[in-house]
């Protein structure tokens, strides 16, 4: 759903996609997007977390891309020294760091990812909700990812009502009766 929505809205020609992924299900959605984008454009995954702590869904999708898509593991601030964005390239950043299950402010290493995400000029797309934002209230934590568009799964999160003009809601096959 992320890949299709971004492709409908933005021209991928000449772009490089950078997936900022965490270790939960939101990160798993980022890994799925990485696999699909990699069929068309260069993709790099910046993984902020511990492979040993991946959710079941995230681990499944991580394993599908680990041999075909470059993944940089970032656990410390020092690991960021290996990340450089060439200014001549045009980027699409995908925020798949945190999902709806996170409450409170982002912790290390996720906060490093949010800082890096916000520091560069790129088209910025959030998966389900911007990392660092409360899904119920729409309030931002100490750090929150910037966004040009939010690709929201199944329905508009309660806290994102004020951002509905920048939000695309996509179905992912969950019947209303199961929500």
Model-derived features with residue positions:
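Nucleotide and nucleotide-moiety/phosphate-recognizing core
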Residues: 3-97, 105-127
């Amino acid at each position: 759903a992320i890949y299709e929505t971004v492709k409908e809205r933005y021209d991928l020609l000449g772009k490089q996609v950078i997936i900022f992924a965490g270790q939960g299900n939101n990160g798993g959605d980022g890994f799925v997007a990485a696999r699909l984008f990699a069929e068309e454009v260069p993709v790099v995954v910046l993984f902020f977390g511990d492979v040993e702590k991946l959710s079941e869904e995230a681990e499944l999708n991580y394993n599908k891309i680990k041999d075909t898509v470059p993944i940089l593991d970032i656990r410390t601030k020092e690991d960021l020294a290996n990340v450089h964005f060439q200014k001549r390239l045009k980027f699409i950043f995908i925020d798949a760091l945190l999902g709806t299950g996170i409450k409170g402010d982002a912790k290390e290493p996720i906060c490093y990812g949010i800082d890096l995400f916000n520091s560069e000029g790129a088209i910025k797309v959030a998966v389900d909700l911007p990392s660092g934002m409360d899904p119920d209230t729409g309030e931002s934590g100490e750090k929150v990812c910037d966004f040009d568009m939010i690709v929201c799964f199944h329905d508009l999160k309660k806290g994102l009502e004020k951002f509905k003009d920048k939000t695309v809601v996509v179905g992912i096959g969950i019947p209303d009766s199961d929500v």
